Amino acid sequence: VVAADALLQTGLSPEALLRCASEGERGPKRDTHPDNIAPALHGGIVMVRPEEPEIVIPLPVPTGLAVALVHPDLELETSEMRGILPDVLPLKQAVRQWGDCAALVVGLYEEDWDLITRALVDRAAEPHRSPFIPGFDAVRAAGLEAGALGAGLSGSGPSMFALCRSVSEAESVATAMAGAFAEVGLEGSDTHVSEVGDTGAHVIEAPA
């Protein structure tokens, strides 16, 4: 949508671009949540309130924060992974998850690595999706042992992510996690490492 907006010179606002991009992610139930689109457009880390229109709230990125992403040689259908999630979350479990979310926001603002580590817990989706990832627990453990702040399932999977204090640490973590996947027969995982930047999708100038 950013490229189309630039090509057509429509001058759409960030909010309008978000709505257009979100339409492309609508599922069979005609529902959508811009949890992927918003950070791609805005960059960095954002929080999204699912209102009409959605409210996108940028959050601070601690200095040096990097991410390692490991994609094993495995295919999972996003629609199926969405379908296995329960419609209702037990109150006790929900309360703990709300607390984790709040702690993560505070950790980002204060650059508190320890608090970020303790807050990186998915109590809602991961318990239901992780059984479909061979070696999930071992892969996460390998990432943590290599120094990651936290690790878990990326979206619907099968990719797994890890947040790290630096790019060099993230490279070591990615290697360790890919190795753990190989030990359960999923060799040749794709790995990607990047600092968490604050620049979203934008038009770049072609080299002269």
Model-based region annotation:
Residues D5, E145-A148:
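Long, contiguous secondary-structure blocks with strong helical propensity
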Residues G150-S154, V193:
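Short beta-strand
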Residues G157-C164:
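Short beta-strand->loop micro-motif that forms the acidic, two-metal-ion catalytic signature
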